[in-house]
A protein has these predicted regions:
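Hydrophobic positions in the central parallel beta-sheet of the AAA+
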Residues: 36, 60-61, 84, 110-112, ...
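Conserved helix/coil segment N-terminal to the catalytic DExD/H
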Residues: 42-45, 49, 90-133
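Short glycine-/polar-rich loops that comprise or flank the Walker A/P-loop
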Residues: 56-58, 79-82, 107, 130-132
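Conserved pre-motif I regulatory segment
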Residues: 1-39
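Walker A/P-loop
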Residues: 31-50, 60-65
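Residues at the C-terminal ends
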Residues: 29-30, 54, 78, 104, ...
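Conserved Walker A/P-loop ATP-binding site and its immediately adjacent core
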Residues: 57-79, 88-90, 94, 113-118
Length: 134
């Protein structure tokens, strides 16, 4: 059975969590809301990526930085994680394909820009899916 430590090792290649990460992961897996304020390079992404892979639905990550979305998704895909981003750097055809694949259950983690949350089409998409975390 998968657990946070096995995901951490198998997917991300780390033997152990950094200080504070395991508590955040445990709380998220318990369904608690968490605000984690950590310095740059402290491993915030692992704190939501590990639970995202253990929870049943999709995790939506809201990020205002297109370059960060691309970097994060690229690293996740390279690690074998089904991830995608949806922002204005994509063409209309690319957006439609991404949403089509998301509806078919291709992705575990989807990165979106904050303004995407206000778009009726995305709201309908989110209402039709099982969203585990935002």
């Amino acid at each position: 059975m998968e657990n946070p430590h096995s995901i951490l090792k198998k997917v991300f290649g780390y033997d152990s969590f950094r200080p504070g990460q395991e508590e955040i992961v445990s709380r998220l897996l318990a369904g608690q809301d968490v605000l984690a304020v950590m310095p740059t390079g402290a491993g915030k992404s692992i704190c939501y990526q590990v639970p995202a892979l253990l929870l049943p639905g999709i995790t939506i990550v809201v990020s205002p930085l297109v370059s960060l979305m691309k970097d994060q998704v690229g690293a996740l895909v390279q690690a074998g994680v089904a991830a995608a981003f949806l922002n204005n750097s994509l063409t209309d055809n690319q957006k439609a394909l991404m949403l089509h694949r998301a509806r078919e259950g291709w992705y575990k983690i989807i990165y979106v820009a904050p303004e995407r949350l206000e778009m009726p089409g995305f709201q309908r998409f989110a209402q039709e899916r099982q969203i585990s975390m935002v």
